[in-house]
Amino acid sequence: MAKDKASRRPRAETPKGFRDYFGADVTERKAMLDAVAEVYHRYGFDPLETSAVETVEALGKFLPDVDRPNEGVFGWQDEDGDWLALRYDLTAPLARVAAQFRNDLPSPYRRYAMGPVWRNEKPGPGRFRQFYQCDADTVGSASVAADAEICAMLSDALEVVGIPRGDYIVRVNNRKVLNGVMEVAGVLDPSDPAKFEAERGIVLRAIDKIDRLGKTGVRALLGAGRKDESGDFTKGAGLSDEQAEVVMGFMAAKRDTGAATAARLRELVGASTLGCEGVQELETIAELLDAQGYGPDRIVVDPSVVRGLGYYTGPVFEAELTFEILDEKGRKRQFGSVAGGGRYDDLVKRFTGQSVPATGVSIGVDRLLAALRAKGRAGAEAQGPVVVTVMDRDRMGDYMAMVGELRRAGLRAELYLGNPKNFGNQLKYADARKSPVAVIQGSDEATRGVVVLKDLVLGAQIAAGASLEEWKSRPAQVEVPRADLVRAVQDMLS
């Protein structure tokens, strides 16, 4: 008879698109985020923690005629018939908080948030359904000083976690300038908002592919279209040659100085009121940053930044790491973007009907941590705790006292809690824990009032071929008075 399926043991496996974080992965991420939080705190930003679960209505998702919410979120229906979902970013919860507590929060409201988000998307290599975000936003200020502050804060955050100047650049652009350029080129008609948005979207999707397709590929997509290597044809935006060249000119407008870049942008936007407003905002941001000591070696106006132009309403910024790494095929490439943000002035409007200006930035936590590992600032093998071994079951109190003394001195220590019968297994455990020191005291050592300290790091070095002189100058095992346990361990660790 077939085995009863109900009695089958559950499989111990992580769901597709999810992963577990162990030891150093957790501590390194926490250390990095703590450093970033300290920067945000100095800038006057307050921490905010929101529920992992939001109403689908608050998230801005709609409910199609199916049994679950729109693809992209993990959602379910509760007993009251309300649709709930795990948050897919940290911005949507901020919008809800800003609307719900608008009479209690200061205005402007500066907040930062860090935590996991969930997206119901097809997983793949390096693409997970749960990942960490680190956001900082200012809600309630229309001043571009708020945008400049976000850029400066982002620069400081990158440096404090270990990305030196010269290895990163924060690039700033403005959606208003691109809109002005397209208006002058005759691509957009501001009097028809629906058509304006549709046509702008087509152009944005084309220029957003600049990194992958290059200038030639984007130029083709701005025109009739592009045929790829497989022969598949992608219909283009249908711009005339003159219109396409104006848009391409916008992306190539960067000059050696911010002033020269702004001058070129003014030429491109011509008489467009919106475009001139965008150029003025970029000039003001550059001036405010320069007044604080943030020069073009750290933050620069760069019209080639196109990511997010379809989402933001004004200035946009992107932090790019400029040092080289080797990809999976051994080829050199720049590390690339680790953070992005911008101004989005419709944050709270759908809740209250009133426009509330906002600007912010989001750091890709996993990408930034990967960058630190590539720079050797993270990923080093973490040191484990000092392990106090057990030689006599009847003296557990003595061993616990040793552990307590070490901990009170600020040292990481633990007592071996496995079966103490086989001492070799205790040392194997200490090795598996990457312990630097093992504390040993049998009945003979206890009678003489001493303990034995085994330097496991040096022992490993000797096993790997340390010289005789090195071994003699620092023996891998020493005997010290019991009263000197803490000092001796501290000396060995130093």
UniProtKB/Swiss-Prot annotation:
* UniProt-listed InterPro entries: aa-tRNA-synth_II, aa-tRNA-synth_II/BPL/LPL, Anticodon-bd, Anticodon-bd_dom_sf, His-tRNA-ligase, HisRS-like_core, HisRS/HisZ, HisRS_anticodon
Query: Which cysteine pairs make disulfide bonds?
Result: none
Task: Give the protein's recorded name.
Answer: Histidine--tRNA ligase
Q: Which GO terms describe its molecular function?
A: ATP binding; histidine-tRNA ligase activity
Q: What's one GO BP annotation on this UniProt entry? A: histidyl-tRNA aminoacylation
Q: Name one Pfam family in it.
A: tRNA-synt_His
Q: Which SUPFAM superfamilies match?
A: Class II aaRS ABD-related (SSF52954), Class II aaRS and biotin synthetases (SSF55681)
Q: Which domain of life is it from?
A: Bacteria
Report which reactions are catalysed by this protein. Answer: tRNA(His) + L-histidine + ATP = L-histidyl-tRNA(His) + AMP + diphosphate + H(+)
Outline the subunit composition: Homodimer.
* HAMAP family tied to this protein: His_tRNA_synth
